[in-house]
From Swiss-Prot:
Catalyzed reaction equations: acetate + ATP = acetyl phosphate + ADP
One GO process term, biological-process aspect: acetyl-CoA biosynthetic process
Cofactor section: Mg(2+); Mn(2+)
Name of the gene this protein is made from: ackA
NCBIfam families: ackA
Protein name: Acetate kinase
Biochemical pathway: Metabolic intermediate biosynthesis; acetyl-CoA biosynthesis; acetyl-CoA from acetate: step 1/2
A cellular component term, taken from the record's GO annotations: cytoplasm
Function summary: Catalyzes the formation of acetyl phosphate from acetate and ATP. Can also catalyze the reverse reaction.
UniProt cross-references to Pfam families, sorted A to Z: Acetate_kinase
Cell location: Cytoplasm
Amino acid sequence: MTKYVLVLNSGSSSIKFQVLDPEANATADPFVSGIVEKIGEKKGHIQIQTETSKMEDNRPILSHSVGLERAFGMMTLLGVGPQDLDLVAAGHRVVHGGATFTEPVLIDDEVIEQLKELIPLAPLHNPANIDGIENARALLEHVPHVAVFDTAFFSTLPEHAANYAIKKDIADEYNIRRYGFHGTSHEYVSSKVPDLLGKPAEEVNQITLHLGNGASAAAIRGGEAVDTTMGLTPLAGLVMGTRSGDIDPGIIFHLARSGGMTVDQADKLLNRESGLKGMAGVNDFRELKTLIEDGDENAQLAYDVYIHALRRFIGSYMLILGGVDAIVFTAGVGENAVQVRRDAMADLQNFGIEIDDARNENSEGIVGAREISTDDSTVKVFVVPTNEELAIARQATELAEQQ
């Protein structure tokens, strides 16, 4: 009998989940996928998708617990309820593990209390993650629950990369350092590269580029992260869909003094109203492309700023690593935006990087990892589809089976 893992990602107004076979091929569809969204709004939405059927519910959803319980009930009606499956674990994505959690952990009451202590580090994400964990534990009491942290992969950062140049006692008191995010994705795709190159993992230097609505880059040496663009929070680094990425911190002081902006207003500005959306009015790359084709100058400038930031970090990481064997594009934009890949890698022949336009463009129908660099390119460029849910399922299974 196939053993399954329930993987949950609980957000502020939604819950996404999948039921997966942790031993399945990376390109296999999940056994069950579901979403609970618009929690707390007048009209909610729950959708459950199996290999053969789909069910939807548009009634109001008062809370996360109500939504998850209703979703499990719908799964039961489809014959794939949690009680019908041999669930070996429930894996929970948790955005911030701070310095406390540097690897997946089996969840108990003490772990939940420790997670609550980390809320100041991720006030936008961790409360919803914790809510999802508590609701799932209440509904699935006899299933081992495992937390997998976005930050864990970056616990290997050297001290000179992890620390900020601010007063040490303040940094220590408030746990201020570079934690990094998207770690599950960076770890997953980077683990595929040694086989693509035919080299031992410990000999591979690579730059991984997770480009979605949120975006981050990582420098990885011998399978361990040595630098990454996101920092204390997911706001730092690359230009993103709605986040500014790196800016001069003095901008915030200027807005506070000259414009009377509050901390909460600045938070909203930089996290939700900046990036591509702030500059061009849209954060979807397909819409941005349409605006550019229509001659929108703001959209073109937003795109140029995005590419400039991306190339700046790629160049920086090449120097930090002392040369690279591979550059990897992943996530929604990284996997699908042909022009972003082309422009990010343009005119780098002097650094041993050369894109094959045909390979870059003619990727429709190709499943799995693929090379988009030329045969003569000494630095290989790959597109590697990420699968964070499968990675979480495998890590949760491994830990649960050790108990």
